[in-house]
Regions:
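Short, charged, amphipathic alpha-helices and their helix-cap/turn boundaries
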Residues: 1-15
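Domain-terminus/edge residues, biased toward the C-terminal soluble/receptor-binding domains
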Residues: 11-15, 25-28, 32-233
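Diglycine-centered glycine-rich loop/turn motifs
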Residues: 18-19
Length: 233
């Protein structure tokens, strides 16, 4: 089931032999696959609540006294190591073995923009753990050099040929909603390209308002940064 779900998420570089992540030569993954796992897990509100909790008091039971547990993620807590707390960080999980080094998948949110960072194989020696400092560097670089930018608006119109209509031979299409993309602040307009993919080269009448007839794809430097359905006007 783990392999099946990983494939459904688009993971291609992972191999599992245990559920706990402890070292085994045949147990491995990649930073990209871990990001894909994380992106899916973040859709679960309970998961995010747990991962963003710095400490939690476990009530006393008939087996143990009250206990307080702390996160090992120093981006959100100073309990374990001082000096790594990062403004906006709210997850997710540390991991380390002698073979893998110090690893961290984390997330941070500033000005409404959430980012995920994955660092693997970092060095550490008690009070200094590079997985936290390297993650902070990645966040600082991204937030300092990228910003949200509108790349499509609902008043943009595209043509769709129509057959079997007495009134017109085309219908106008528009993006279902305005589209923003997280792009370099110095991105040039000529490097942002738009392409239209129609479901059919020619659609038969009648066409109803709001009918989905295609997709608008926006790319930056040949990388897809957004896709949006095109609807009939």
């Amino acid at each position: 089931l783990m392999y099946q779900r990983a494939q459904e998420l688009g993971c291609t570089g992972s191999h599992f032999v245990n559920p706990n992540g402890l070292h085994d030569p045949n147990h491995y993954s990649t930073a990209w696959d871990i990001y894909l796992f994380t992106r899916e897990a973040m859709k679960n509100e309970t998961f995010m609540k747990i991962c963003s909790t710095a400490s939690y008091v476990v009530p006393a039971t008939n087996m143990s006294e009250e206990r307080e547990l702390y996160t090992t993620n120093s981006l959100i807590s100073n309990w374990r190591i001082m000096g790594y707390q990062y403004d906006g960080a709210d997850g997710i999980k540390t991991g380390s073995t002698e073979e893998s080094g110090y690893c961290l998948v984390s997330t941070a949110k500033r000005s409404g923009r959430r980012l995920v960072a994955v660092v693997l194989g970092c060095k550490g020696n008690g009070a200094t753990v590079e997985s936290f400092s390297e993650s902070a560097k990645l966040y600082n670089w991204a937030y300092n050099n990228f910003s949200m930018r509108q790349v499509a608006a609902t008043d943009e119109l595209y043509r769709q040929p129509v057959a079997l209509s007495k009134q017109t031979d085309t219908v106008m299409l528009y993006p279902a909603q305005s589209v923003e993309a997280f792009l370099p602040k110095d991105a040039k307009d000529e490097d942002i390209r738009k392409s239209v993919t129609l479901k059919e080269d020619v659609v038969n009448a009648p066409v109803t308002a709001g009918q989905e007839l295609g997709t608008l794809t926006i790319t930056y430097n040949d990388q897809v940064c957004a896709e949006e359905p095109l609807l009939a006007q």
